[in-house]
A protein has these predicted regions:
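Glycine-rich cofactor-pocket loops
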Residues: 31-33, 63-77, 289-300, 314-355, ...
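Acidic, low-complexity proline/glycine-rich segments
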Residues: 1-26, 278-283, 321-322, 327-334, ...
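Internal maturation/activation junctions in enzymes
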Residues: 130-133, 144-186, 370-389, 407, ...
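A short core secondary-structure module
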Residues: 190, 194-248
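C-terminal amphipathic alpha-helical interaction region
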Residues: 102, 460, 475-596
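Amphipathic, small/basic residue-rich leader segments at the start of a protein or domain
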Residues: 1-127, 147, 151, 374, ...
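A glycine-rich, basic-preceded beta-loop-alpha segment at the flavin cofactor/substrate interface
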Residues: 199, 237-254, 259, 266-297, ...
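Alpha-helix capping/hinge segments and adjacent helical runs
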Residues: 2-5, 185, 262, 368, ...
Length: 596
C-alpha cells in the first residue's frame, strides 16, 4: 500500500550542512567520537528497518486493529507487530540514544531523532509502543531511586520491557488537579494504588513481556489540587530480585477504545485495584517528575506529525506524476498521452509544495531542538547548558502544536491530490489524515501548548527566552541584509521578528488587567511564532542552497524553490494571525453562554 523511502538526503543536509552536528559534537565529551560516517550508517540502516519491516505493516495494522479479550484482560496487537518489535529489539534500536551505564549505545539525541522520524513515517501506531518507553526511561533516569534505576532501566533500555504514562481519568484530562486515584502506604515502603485511568496508549499489549506504568495518584495526606499529586512506578508483573517476572500486579486493561485513527496502537482503560507501586521522586511532587516524560512525549508527537507529513507527501507526489487528467492551462506537456500528469496543474503543485515545505521546515526545527537537548545534557559549560535549556523550553510547544497543526494541513492536502481516490481506504491516504488528527490533541492539546508558550514560557519571564532567540535572528538579518540574493528571505524574516516583539508587548500589557487576553491571543500567537522560527530556518537553508547554486546536485535547486514557496505562500498567513491575536478577548467573551 503506497511507498515510503526514508529522506536520507534531506536528513544529511540538515545534520551535516545546516546544523554541522559533527563540529558541535567536538564540544560535547560524550559524542566527540561521532563522525559523519557513523551518522550516515545509522541513517542507512534505520531506513532499511523502517522501509522493509515497519512500513508493510502500517495499512494492515490499521485495518486489523488491536483485539481485546475481556476474559483474560489481554490485548493482541495486529499481525506482524510482535515480530517487528522483536527485530527492533534484536537490532539494538531501542538502546540507540540511551545511557551506556544501563546498556544503551549512547548516541546523540539529534541522531536518534532522525531515526524516530523514520519510525513514525513508516508506522506511527507501532512506534508508540517503544516510543513511550523512552519517555519512561528519561523520567526514571532523572527522578528514580538508585534501586528503581538498577531494576528497571536496563530492561527499558534493551526493549525487553515497555513503559507508559497513566495520567488521564474520566473526569480530568487537562486539569490533573481533579485527579482521584489513591495510593495507600504499606509498611514495606511500597504503596497500594487504586483508581481508573483512560486513554492510556500501549497500556496493554503482547509485544513485550512486562509493562512499566508510571501512574499519578494521591497519598492520604495530599493537599488538594495539582500540588497533591505523586508519581508511582507500577509494573504489570512485579519483578523478582533476579530480574525475572514474578506475581501479576492488579493493574488490568478493562477495555480498549474505538478510535478515529492509530488503530494499531491499543488505547486502554486501565483499572488499578490495590496495585503495588513504588514512589518516584518526592511525595506530592509527581507532576514535576512526570513533566520530564511529558516534555519528551510532546517533542515526540511533533515528530509523529513530521513523519506523517513526509510519507503523505511522498505518496501524493508519486500519484501526481502518474495520474493524467486534463491538459495544462499553458498547453500540453505530454502530447503523446490523452492528458497531462496532474503535477502540471498549479494548485496540485501548491498542495504538494505545502506538504514538502512543512516537512522540510519541521525536520530542521526538530533536529535543531534535538541538538539543543544534546548541548543541554552534555556541554561542559554551564552557561551553554542553560542557554540550550531555554531554547528547548521555548521551542517545545512550537514542535508540539505548530508542527502538528501543519501535519493535519499537509496530510489533508496530500489526500486531496488524489481526488476521490484519496477518500478510499485502499489508497492509504485517508489513514494518514486520521492518524494525524490525534497529534493535535494528546500530550497536551494545542491550545494548552499555546497557553504554555505565551503565558509561561514568554510572559512569565518577561520575554527573556524569546528575546534571546530573537537576538540570533537579528544577528542573521544584519549579517545578510546587504546580500541582494538573500533579500527575499531576510526582509520578511526581519519584519516578522519586529512584529512579534511589538505584539508580545501589547498582549502582555493587556494581560495585566485581564488574563482572558492571554487565552484569546494564545493560539494565533503560537502560530505566528512558529512561522518566525520556520522563517529563520528556511532563510538559513536558502543561504546554503544559494552558495551551492552552481552545483550539479539538483537537491539545492529544490531546497531553494521550497524556501521561496514558503515565504510566498505560507508565511503570509502571519498578517491574518497577528490581527487575530491583537483583536482582544471581547469578541470571544462578551456573548452570554446561554446565547450560544
Amino acid at each position: 500500500m503506497g511507498q515510503y523511502v526514508a529522506p536520507i538526503r534531506d536528513m544529511q543536509f540538515v545534520l551535516h550542512e545546516f546544523l554541522n552536528v559533527t563540529e558541535e559534537f567536538k564540544n560535547l565529551p560524550a559524542y566527540q567520537e561521532i563522525d559523519a560516517d557513523i551518522i550516515n550508517q545509522v541513517l542507512e540502516e534505520g531506513a532499511k528497518f523502517t522501509q522493509e519491516v515497519l512500513f508493510p505493516l502500517n495499512h494492515s495494522g490499521d485495518r486489523e486493529g488491536c483485539h481485546f479479550d475481556a476474559a483474560t484482560k489481554t490485548v493482541t496487537t495486529p499481525k506482524g507487530f510482535k515480530e517487528a518489535y522483536k527485530q527492533y529489539v534484536d537490532g539494538g534500536w531501542a538502546a540507540l540514544g540511551c545511557d551506556p551505564e544501563y546498556g544503551g549505545q549512547g548516541l546523540p539525541v539529534s541522531l536518534n531523532n532522525s531515526f524516530y522520524e523514520m519510525l513514525n513515517s513508516a508506522n506511527q501506531a507501532w512506534t508508540m509502543y517503544p516510543g513511550l518507553s523512552h519517555g519512561a526511561y528519561e523520567c526514571l533516569k532523572e527522578h528514580g531511586s538508585d534501586e528503581q534505576k538498577a531494576q528497571y532501566l536496563p530492561k527499558l533500555v534493551s526493549g525487553e520491557w515497555t513503559g507508559t504514562m497513566c495520567l488521564t481519568e474520566a473526569h480530568c484530562g487537562t486539569d490533573l488537579g481533579l485527579l482521584r486515584s489513591k495510593a495507600e502506604p504499606q509498611g514495606d515502603g511500597t504503596y497500594k494504588i487504586s483508581g481508573s485511568k483512560i486513554f492510556i496508549s500501549a497500556g496493554e499489549h503482547d509485544v513485550a513481556e512486562n509493562i512499566i506504568h508510571l501512574v499519578l495518584a494521591r497519598l492520604p495526606d495530599a493537599p488538594e489540587g495539582s500540588k497533591g499529586i505523586s508519581l508511582f512506578l507500577v509494573p504489570k508483573f512485579l519483578p523478582n530480585a533476579d530480574g525475572s517476572l514474578g506475581e501479576r500486579n492488579p493493574i488490568f486493561c478493562g477495555a480498549i477504545e474505538e478510535k478515529m485513527g492509530i488503530h494499531g496502537n491499543a488505547t486502554c482503560q486501565m483499572n488499578l485495584d490495590g496495585a503495588v507501586g513504588t514512589l518516584i521522586g518526592q511525595p506530592h511532587k509527581g507532576l514535576n517528575a512526570m513533566f520530564v516524560f511529558m516534555n519528551a512525549a510532546r517533542l515526540g508527537v511533533g515528530m509523529q506529525s513530521l513523519g506523517l507529513t513526509e510519507v503523505a507527501y511522498q505518496n501524493a507526489l508519486v500519484y501526481a506524476k502518474d495520474r493524467i487528467q486534463m491538459r495544462s492551462l499553458s498547453g500540453p506537456k505530454a502530447p503523446d498521452k490523452p492528458a497531462d500528469p496532474i503535477i502540471v496543474h498549479p494548485d496540485v503543485r501548491r498542495m504538494l509544495l505545502t506538504a514538502k515545505a512543512y516537512a522540510e521546515g519541521a525536520r530542521a526545527v526538530c533536529s535543531y531542538v534535538a541538538l539543543q537537548i544534546d548541548r543541554e545534557l552534555n556541554h561542559p559549560d554551564e552557561d551553554v547548558r542553560k542557554e540550550a535549556a531555554g531554547e528547548v523550553a521555548l521551542l517545545t510547544p512550537i514542535v508540539k502544536a505548530f508542527i502538528t497543526d501543519n501535519g493535519w494541513i499537509a496530510t489533508s492536502e496530500a489526500m486531496q491530490v488524489y481526488g476521490g481516490h484519496g477518500y478510499i481506504s485502499e489508497w492509504g491516504m485517508e489513514q494518514y489524515v486520521r492518524d494525524a488528527r490525534i497529534n493535535m490533541i494528546y500530550e497536551g492539546t494545542n491550545t494548552i501548548q499555546s497557553l504554555d508558550l505565551l503565558g509561561r514560557k514568554i510572559l512569565m519571564d518577561n520575554g527573556a527566552k524569546l528575546r534571546a532567540f530573537g537576538e540570533k535572528i537579528k544577528a542573521f538579518v544584519e549579517e545578510n541584509g546587504l546580500d541582494e540574493s538573500m533579500s527575499e528571505f531576510v526582509t520578511p524574516l526581519g519584519e516578522l521578528g519586529e512584529k512579534v516583539g511589538k505584539m508580545t508587548m501589547e498582549i502582555g500589557m493587556k494581560a495585566f488587567t485581564n488574563q482572558d487576553e492571554v487565552g484569546a491571543a494564545a493560539v494565533p500567537y503560537l502560530r505566528v511564532v512558529g512561522h518566525l522560527v520556520f522563517s529563520y530556518f528556511f532563510a538559513q537553508m536558502a543561504k546554503i542552497a544559494l552558495e551551492k547554486k552552481d552545483s550539479d546536485d539538483k537537491f539545492y535547486e529544490s531546497k531553494l524553490a521550497t524556501a521561496r514557496f514558503y515565504f510566498a505562500r505560507l508565511y503570509p498567513e502571519t498578517a491574518m494571525l497577528i490581527r487575530q491575536a491583537r483583536s482582544g478577548s471581547a469578541n470571544l467573551m462578551a456573548l452570554d453562554a446561554d446565547l450560544f
